[in-house]
């Protein structure tokens, strides 16, 4: 009997293998029948593929090239007319899963010059959020610094701001995802998601001592 870790890896490979056919060659995602696709889906797919590669070192699933598909997903997400914070943040972490710098990144090598420029521009975009959306700024800052697109690392400052908001909105140090709503706070799964996402970003940061 496989240990729990191996079972989880087998399950992940099975799920990815069952869904990888939904990724088109241009990086767009085919929606499930009778459903509509979301603008952020290519970015989510890029991160799923990147994490599988990071965990296994594999570059193929069921004969499909993970590197090429991730590059296609990132290209689709980056060049999409509809800008989505989460799609870009997820695709950024998917990119970093293939290497901590652009000199050693299999996917970066596949991106066109136009996509690289658009990615740099969109990673620089910032909105000051009061809720869980702030974690996407953290991921974008990690990607921008790690890929050498900026010499200034804003990661620490953005994490501090995220934690300051928790202090401001909850005396119990709980993550309130709707602080502007008055006394009715929202303490749901997004609090856990936020800390997991930040941890993921720091794991992929070029500066492992941050």
Residue ranges and their predicted role:
Residues 1-51, 63-65:
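Low-complexity, Ser/Thr/Pro/Gly-enriched N-terminal "stalk/linker" regions
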Residues 34-56, 62-210:
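Aromatic-lined, polymer-binding surfaces characteristic
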